[in-house]
Amino acid sequence: MRIGLYPGTFDPVTLGHLDIIRRASTLVDRLVIGVAINRDKGPLFSLEERVAMLEAECAAVSAETGTEIVAHPFENLLIDCARDVGASMIIRGLRAVADFEYEFQMVGMNRRLDDSIETVFLMAEAEHQAIASKLVKEIARLGGDVTPFVTSQVRAALVDRFGPPQMNAAQ
């Protein structure tokens, strides 16, 4: 069984994340979404909320692709999480050159820690390259409409936190 690990904070999960999840699920038999517990980032959504959002959003992808997709919180080293879940590959999405530079360094470190686990990069589709969870939260906080960047469920969760979009936010 081919198991892949797609790690991230997913605060919140975006259409870009879901695109990578959908495409990654065609490469493996089981896709583990590693939900990072990163206390330094101070997430907007709790771990439980992020896991619940991912599980809800991934159910349709799993049904579509036939791949088992599970959310798995982790707080240890990424390579240790990969070992814990039996992953033979770590899947990372790339949006820009800056992402590649960071990921290139991480691959080198992970290979030194365990050279049996490969890293696979999937390029973000053009329409998702500018999407970042940090920017989505900022748009929502400032009263903008996040509809182009997240699903309706995630948009509703952001509206619960920040209120509805303001009509003049884009002006």
Swiss-Prot record:
This is Phosphopantetheine adenylyltransferase. Reversibly transfers an adenylyl group from ATP to 4'-phosphopantetheine, yielding dephospho-CoA (dPCoA) and pyrophosphate. Substrate binds at T9, K41, L78, R92. It is an enzyme of class 2 (transferase). It comes from Dinoroseobacter shibae (strain DSM 16493 / NCIMB 14021 / DFL 12). One of its GO terms (molecular function) is pantetheine-phosphate adenylyltransferase activity. Its EC number is 2.7.7.3. It catalyses: (R)-4'-phosphopantetheine + ATP + H(+) = 3'-dephospho-CoA + diphosphate. Its cofactor is Mg(2+). Pathway: Cofactor biosynthesis; coenzyme A biosynthesis; CoA from (R)-pantothenate: step 4/5.
